[in-house]
Amino acid sequence: MRKLLIFLAGLAVVIAVAGETILPRWAHDTAETLLHEAGAEEAETMLHTSPGVLLLFGQIDDISASAKGLRLGQLRLDRAELRGADVRLDAPALFLDRKVHVKSAEELKLTGTVSAESLRDLLARHVDKLDNIEVALDEEGVHATAQAKIFGRKADILLEGKIVEEPDALFFHMTRFDIKNAAFGKANIGDFFGDILITKLSALPLKAQIDSVEHRDGAVVVRLSCRNPR
């Protein structure tokens, strides 16, 4: 019995030490690895849980992370900031499948900043008739100029739009489409461009809601938060 008690006491010490040293380092490295796998070119994370052994059950008391190049659906975020408190992850999915599923959180917010270059890349990928795309951003929205061949003639295109939210998705929505220097009469703009789905919220690793989309000079800021706080 005495040997068993000594063994159990030693095991408890090992678990306690691992919980305060090995597990936090492993969790930190895993978080940064997952951010890189999600497209981040640079990533920094800080997380804290006490006692540390609770990390084995997916419990994170506080987390903050910043990343460059993280992808939100079809958009590259030039900067992404994540803040969370009392976050509970699906531990089996994290450890066995390396997938992040948020079960609950007292607070979990993501702020992403989108540049003109990111929106230019979005338009270039989804509108194959447009060339030489240039994009500018201000408080009114997205302003783009481009060129396109329409009915064999080169035309100058002026396109405007906004990133808009719906209850279950984020879109790029066109608000203006002008064609200049094209002697073919009125064009059907639906043939050349339509709304672009950026992401469905159901595709994100947490049940999220879009809090706001703010168009600024030189950037668009998108804010999301966990939809089912405890």
Annotate the PLM regions:
Residues L4-E20:
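Hydrophobic membrane-insertion alpha-helices, especially the h-region
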Residues A16-S50:
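N-terminal amphipathic/hydrophobic interface segments
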Residues A40-I133, L137-I150:
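N-terminal beta-strand/beta-hairpin edge segment
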Residues Q59-I60, V164-A169, G218:
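Short, solvent-exposed coil/turn segments at beta-strand boundaries
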Residues V114-G190, G194:
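Soluble extracytoplasmic domains of inner/organellar membrane proteins
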Residues F184-R230:
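Extracytoplasmic/luminal low-complexity segments enriched in Pro/Gly and acidic/polar residues
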